[in-house]
Amino acid sequence: MFNPSKDEVRQFFLSAWQRHRAGGVLTPLELIAADWMEQHPEYQAELSDTQSASRDYAVEQGRTNPFLHLSMHLSIAEQVSIDQPPGIRQAFELLRSRLGEHDAHHVIMECLGEMLWTAQRSSLPPDGAAYVDCVQRRATAR
């Protein structure tokens, strides 16, 4: 399983953004990342600053971690592409039809964060079925 360190993740985004801005050749994963970075102009100054790789992004300070946020976009895109956990693609499609791709990702992100928080707190593996159920509920809520 691919399990990069925090520093490797941050360097991935910084170098992909730099190559994207310079018109360089990107890997398929970097192309997906660059698309999400383009959709988040609020992060672009930090992505252009190599010092951002060593910053703390404490929620208590009201700072969103751009690397975590973009990583979640990549995770969700991968999950949807392979329908893992099963049912996530259908739930995403329902959300996308109502909200558009970007907003659908943000709704799914809330469920993903909730699932990971619950798993950490309970010292159990992430519950993919509960995650998909959360997304389905939000996709069908009026």
Predicted regions and their residues:
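Core of compact, soluble alpha-helical bundle domains
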Residues: F2-T64
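Short alpha-helical scaffolding segments that buttress acidic/His motifs in well-ordered protein cores
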Residues: F13, A33, M37, S71-I76, ...
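Short, surface-exposed helix-loop/turn micro-motifs enriched in polar/charged residues
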Residues: M1, G24-V25, G87, A104, ...
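Amphipathic alpha-helical interaction elements
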Residues: M1, Q18-A22, D35, V80, ...
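Heme-based O2/NO sensor domains and their adjacent alpha-helical segments
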Residues: E42-S97
